[in-house]
Amino acid sequence: MEPTPMLRDRDHDDAPPTYEQAMGLCPTTVSTPPPPPPDCSPPPYRPPYCLVSSPSPRHTFDMDMMEMPATMHPTTGAYFDNGWKWTFALLVVAILGIIFLAVVFTVVINRDNSTATGTSSG
């Protein structure tokens, strides 16, 4: 047995928005705030924050580098002279970390196996 379809009452449906309303092209009325009373004092003056706060140290470094002439800047290769040392150090640390994890893993596996079989080392 098929369910009976729900019939819509089209008289109570809202009309869809017009193209202008949907695209935001219809004229909008913007109400301005009422003028303040004549005896009202203006808000206190606050200078912009960019004039009050000091720049962060990184921006200070960037500004200092910009003030240096381009001929005094270090060459690009100077930044990579010690790169091989850092690469080697990172490789050694990674290998030591893998060895450490392997040792911990085998100790945990052996401990679980010894408790499961009922043998105790010692």
Curated annotation (Swiss-Prot):
- What does the record say about the knockout? In the absence of functional UL42, a significant amount of gB interacts with host ITCH leading to gB ubiquitination and degradation.
* Membrane-spanning parts: 89-109
Q: Indicate where this protein is primarily found.
A: host cell
- Give start-end positions of Pro residues composition bias: 32-47
Question: What is any one GO biological process for this UniProt entry?
Answer: symbiont-mediated suppression of host innate immune response
Mutating Y45A leads to what result? Complete loss of interaction with host ITCH
Report residue spans for region: Disordered. 1-47
Q: Subcellular localization, per the record? A: Host membrane; Host cytoplasm
Q: Report the domain remarks.
A: Late-budding domains (L domains) are short sequence motifs essential for viral particle budding. They recruit proteins of the host ESCRT machinery (Endosomal Sorting Complex Required for Transport) or ESCRT-associated proteins. Contains one L domain: a PPXY motif which is involved in the interaction with Itch, a member of the Nedd4 family.
**Protein name as catalogued:** Protein UL42
In its UniProt entry, the species of origin is given as Human cytomegalovirus (strain Towne)
